[in-house]
Design a protein with these regions (language model features):
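Core segments of transmembrane alpha-helices
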Residues: 53-64, 78-81, 105
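Membrane-interface helix caps and helix-loop-helix hairpins in membrane proteins
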Residues: 87-99, 144-148
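Membrane-helix boundary connector in multi-pass membrane proteins
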Residues: 89-95, 111-125
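Terminal transmembrane helical module of multi-pass membrane proteins
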Residues: 122-148
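N-terminal signal-anchor transmembrane alpha helix
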Residues: 2-25
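Aromatic-anchored segments of alpha-helical transmembrane domains
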Residues: 17-23, 78-87, 131-138
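Membrane-interface loop-to-helix entry segments
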Residues: 44-58, 93-104
């Protein structure tokens, strides 16, 4: 059996994180369906998402680099649910299902954060903004579900 250096695995996951982030964020809300939705007054302009997400993906990448063996399995799972949120919401126009997806993301990522707090407090510090953003995104998603 071929043994791969754990650092190569970590680098691969960092690259995968950036690719998934790039693909998911390329599916933006510029279509007429999204434009026609009633959105929260706290909904930021589109360019803010283009600034925030790359920063969050960079912080996630650094976190996974530091803690690869500790959180890799949960991280893969959360990365999957992170990626499908955009498709559920923007492509398939399923805000309620995407809300359940984001709640699942929050649950998984709190679990990851609790693990990180025991293993690497700096990595937990880097990861925490992602969870804060997920709560904010959950609010925005919930607002759309309730008001549309």
């Amino acid at each position: 059996m071929l043994k791969v250096d754990p650092k190569i695995n970590a680098i691969s996951l960092v690259i995968l994180t950036l690719i998934v982030g790039s693909l998911a964020s390329s599916n933006t809300g510029t279509d007429s369906w999204y434009q026609g939705l009633v959105k929260s007054d706290l909904n930021p302009p589109g360019y803010v998402f283009g600034i925030v997400w790359p920063i969050l993906y960079l912080l996630m990448g650094i976190t996974i680099w530091r803690t690869y063996n500790t959180i890799k399995n949960l991280f893969y799972v959360q990365l999957f649910f992170n990626a499908i949120w955009s498709w559920l919401f923007f492509s398939f126009h399923l805000p309620l299902i995407s809300l359940f997806d984001i709640w699942l993301l929050i649950f998984i990522n709190i679990k990851i954060l609790l693990i990180l707090l025991k293993q690497d407090k700096f990595a937990a510090f880097l990861y925490a903004p992602y969870i804060v953003w997920l709560f904010f995104a959950s609010y925005l998603n919930l607002f759309i579900v309730i008001n549309n």
